[in-house]
């Protein structure tokens, strides 16, 4: 078994798996994930790179503290303290979902540290709306892209809102199921889920209360993204709810040096569903001059 390191940064415990040698590649999980979400990447990438998989604040083996905060800002600061501790000079950064939003914000704040940026369906909410839990804020998106707006509303109605409600009532199994239904985009059973995803839900679902509360609060603007010079790879699934593709396509148009690749995958978790293709595409991108 690989050894996991845990240290305290920014007032919280962070854990990570560090394997391999060479150019560093740091993997940041999304909501309800942790370092284990990337094990199929770590095993392959560590043959060619120094692969580092991070558990963000409160993620397994950590535990959520009631009332704990997990903003984009805080997660960016956590990762900065971690990479300073690891003495990483320049590295590639891979982020999934909310972890992709964190990775983008990190690259915008510390571009000199980033060699390549890989964003797997990042939840960059400024492209959708600027304030959470207010349907009126979706009206501009309805006129821009009706399919993206309605799919995001379905995710909110089926996933985000009931998950938060179930967590507040300590109905953990219902919270896990509503989260999966909302993000996958159609009704599922927990038994149908990828075992790694289910493991992440089992151990991390309580962290969603903090992350969903502040996910819209980070001041990442279109103007600031247009100034980013980091080479960026955007990855989208061909089966995810439409709003993920909407964000990816808008990022591809906004970031000065970005390319978008679609991977056949049944859910938002491309790196779990299609690991061979995911690994091939990402490693090729990192290896490019």
Can you say where each PLM-predicted feature lies in the sequence?
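Active-site loop/turn elements of alpha/beta-hydrolase fold enzymes
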Residues: 56-58, 122, 265
């Amino acid at each position: 078994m690989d050894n996991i390191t845990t240290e305290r940064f920014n007032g919280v415990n962070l854990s990570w798996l560090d394997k391999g040698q060479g150019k560093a590649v740091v993997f940041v999980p999304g909501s309800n994930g942790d370092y284990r979400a990337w094990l199929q990447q770590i095993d392959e990438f560590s043959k060619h790179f120094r692969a580092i998989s991070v558990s963000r604040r409160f993620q397994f083996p950590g535990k959520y503290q009631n009332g704990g905060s997990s903003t984009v800002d805080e997660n960016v600061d956590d990762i900065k303290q971690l990479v300073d501790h690891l003495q990483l000079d320049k590295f590639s950064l891979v982020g999934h979902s909310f972890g992709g939003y964190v990775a983008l914000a990190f690259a915008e704040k510390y571009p000199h540290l980033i060699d390549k940026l890989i964003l797997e369906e990042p939840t960059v909410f400024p492209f959708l709306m600027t304030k959470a839990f207010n349907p009126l804020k979706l009206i501009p998106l309805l006129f821009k892209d009706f399919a993206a707006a309605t799919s995001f509303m379905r995710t909110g109605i089926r996933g985000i809102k009931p998950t938060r409600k179930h967590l507040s009532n300590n109905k953990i199994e219902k919270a896990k199921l509503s989260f999966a239904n909302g993000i996958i985009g159609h009704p599922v059973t927990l038994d149908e889920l990828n075992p790694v995803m289910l493991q992440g839900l089992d151990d991390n679902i309580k962290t969603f209360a903090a992350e969903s509360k502040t996910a819209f609060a980070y001041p990442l603007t279109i103007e600031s993204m247009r100034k980013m010079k980091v080479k960026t790879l955007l990855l989208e699934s061909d089966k995810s709810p439409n709003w993920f593709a909407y964000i990816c396509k808008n990022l591809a148009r906004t970031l000065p040096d970005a390319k978008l690749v679609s991977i056949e995958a049944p859910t938002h978790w491309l790196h779990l569903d299609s690991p061979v293709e995911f690994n091939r595409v990402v490693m090729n991108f990192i290896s490019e001059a």
